[in-house]
């Protein structure tokens, strides 16, 4: 699968078509917005929805960890959808997840994780990683030279022709942040159009496709 390498200052980041971010320097894999247990939350509220959504999220995550062999997996918030969806079966899976992924895991707490306790996976606050400021919701980094990397927004881009219109997940860069928003990883997540102020890289099939590539960009730049 074709990834896109993007540089921010001294940081070299890989946009992966699996909707994940790879930091080669210390072999860190980042994903956001898995929203596990979402189907069970809908079912509890009387909305019929099949329960296989979590497998459609977790199996690709395990495949990704097997392929890239990260030393650390950072979950940028909203690991679960709501406490109501935290079944015992899901708790068992989450307890085993570090072993299944074969690496250490860190959860930066998101708004959907609030009030939920996950054994062995305490929620951590926003934090620095090199020149990056990692958070769930968009934040202003404490150091103006840092790049905020976050989730929460579930960014998608609209691609339109005369006869068709597609909405594709994307990596979205806002130079005014400066901020990089990564796409939602979960199978049962929607998306929000990130708008023209963002430079966008579309997740299209098994490739990353630069979009609006002429967007002004002071420090971030794409490389082949």
Regions found by a protein language model. Name each.
Residues 1-76, 81-224:
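Extended recognition/assembly regions associated with phosphoester-bond processing machinery
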């Amino acid at each position: 699968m074709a990834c896109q390498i993007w540089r921010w200052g001294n940081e070299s980041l890989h946009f992966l078509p699996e909707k994940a971010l790879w930091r080669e320097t210390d072999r860190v894999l980042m994903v956001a917005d898995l929203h596990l247990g979402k189907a069970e939350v809908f079912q509890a509220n009387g909305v019929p929805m099949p329960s296989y959504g979590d497998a459609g999220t977790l199996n690709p995550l395990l495949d990704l960890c097997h392929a890239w062999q990260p030393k650390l997996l950072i979950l940028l918030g909203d690991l679960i959808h709501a406490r109501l969806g935290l079944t015992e079966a899901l708790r068992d899976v989450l307890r085993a997840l570090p072993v299944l992924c074969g690496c250490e895991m860190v959860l930066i707490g998101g708004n959907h994780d609030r009030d939920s306790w996950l054994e062995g996976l305490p929620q951590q606050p926003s934090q620095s990683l090199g020149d990056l400021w990692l958070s769930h919701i968009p934040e202003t980094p404490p150091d103006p030279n840092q790049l905020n990397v976050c989730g929460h927004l579930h960014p998608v881009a609209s691609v339109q022709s005369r006869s068709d219109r597609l909405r594709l997940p994307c990596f979205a860069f806002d130079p005014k942040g400066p901020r990089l928003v990564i796409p939602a990883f979960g199978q049962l997540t929607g998306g929000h159009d990130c708008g023209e102020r963002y430079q966008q890289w579309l997740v299209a099939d098994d490739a990353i496709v630069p979009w609006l590539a002429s967007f002004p960009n002071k420090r971030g730049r794409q490389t082949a």
